[in-house]
Amino acid sequence: MYRTLAFASLSLYGAARAQQVGTSTAENHPKLTWQTCTGTGGTNCSNKSGSVVLDSNWRWAHNVGGYTNCYTGNSWSTQYCPDGDSCTKNCAIDGADYSGTYGITTSNNALSLKFVTKGSFSSNIGSRTYLMETDTKYQMFNLINKEFTFDVDVSKLPCGLNGALYFVEMAADGGIGKGNNKAGAKYGTGYCDSQCPHDIKFINGKANVEGWNPSDADPNGGAGKIGACCPEMDIWEANSISTAYTPHPCRGVGLQECSDAASCGDGSNRYDGQCDKDGCDFNSYRMGVKDFYGPGATLDTTKKMTVITQFLGSGSSLSEIKRFYVQNGKVYKNSQSAVAGVTGNSITESFCTAQKKAFGDTSSFAALGGLNEMGASLARGHVLIMSLWGDHAVNMLWLDSTYPTDADPSKPGAARGTCPTTSGKPEDVEKNSPDATVVFSNIKFGPIGSTFAQPA
């Protein structure tokens, strides 16, 4: 996946991350019920009362005690942010109007994320949310020898969008107390992922002002010198055309800063960095089964479906990541690979080795420890993220089209979906599909076989 400068937000005040706490708007997390399960068959599940919080990147950042922007469009205030330390002390982030400004709503066990939300004075694009355990702490998950299940409706997600559900090794408290971070998880701080994103405006309690370059493609985004790297488990990256699940191991524990092209894996240094940016992905279309997922396919994306992901292993060891689906009461095993030289319908070390060879891809997955390193990270605990985003880097073509765009679509691994190579430009999607929405619901978590009736 290529989550580079992908998250855009435009509000009346100009979105930004800051580490002090403002007082203009109260922060009230939307409630979300989910379940933990025991036994087998999905019949013994108990409700858990949780909530979601909006990532701090989308929030209004202003001077402490005032109403002047610390970040406007895609540039920092020279008055309040002449350097990283000053900016962090001078600027505060505020509470969020979840539905009115950001298009985020919950109802019992369902979370709905709307792509474009237009208010009286503002427009917001996309969102990223985290599941909370308490008002000040993210819910942590250890996925080893467990399964994670949810329902999803992608029927309103066209080419170029990604309704994503994934896990990253963030701090449970959002890094509160690091540097000048006084906001913490309550305000959605501490993000990192395997793309070592440079668009994170505050990292470890310090503003990412040094070397900040406003994006030419994204009117709200930019890139600072520092990247925020950490292991990532993509359970679900999808629209109505294509879907993939992908482990991304990294070196180190939790959020690791990178500050040069090599360690960040930027540009031509993609395979030199501390994280596996490509990951080992399972996309049924890319694996040669073109009628398994999509509108009217075996898994019909015009209708809601249940997604089950199992993490086979013990302790900190991970041996296999399996996938099942349920739709219209029928259980479907994941599609088998139809690529010559690659067998299986799950992610294992042997599958990843064979797939990289068949596709001619560089395997930073193996170089960075593969499933062993991914398992160690998962055992340390991950935060659940649910988001909706458009891709300012490569228009989501890596997920739903032919990529690279100049590749022969008949070459193994090049075709990932049926979207045209000209599709997915964020400005086009924002204009043509402003009502695009993803709904995640009915989250269940427990031992293998506890969340659904698993076939023999």
From Swiss-Prot:
Its EC number is 3.2.1.91. Residues 407-434 are annotated as: Disordered. It comes from the Eukaryota. InterPro entries: ConA-like_dom_sf (IPR013320), Glyco_hydro_7 (IPR001722), Glyco_hydro_7_sf (IPR037019). One of its GO terms (molecular function) is cellulose 1,4-beta-cellobiosidase activity. The active site is at residues 232, 237. It is an enzyme of class 3 (hydrolase). Keywords: Carbohydrate metabolism, Cellulose degradation, Glycoprotein, Glycosidase, Hydrolase, Polysaccharide degradation, Signal. Pfam families: Glyco_hydro_7. It catalyses: Hydrolysis of (1->4)-beta-D-glucosidic linkages in cellulose and cellotetraose, releasing cellobiose from the non-reducing ends of the chains. Residues 1-18 form the signal peptide. The biological conversion of cellulose to glucose generally requires three types of hydrolytic enzymes: (1) Endoglucanases which cut internal beta-1,4-glucosidic bonds; (2) Exocellobiohydrolases that cut the disaccharide cellobiose from the non-reducing end of the cellulose polymer chain; (3) Beta-1,4-glucosidases which hydrolyze the cellobiose and other short cello-oligosaccharides to glucose. Belongs to the glycosyl hydrolase 7 (cellulase C) family. This is Exoglucanase 1. It comes from Cochliobolus carbonum (Maize leaf spot fungus).
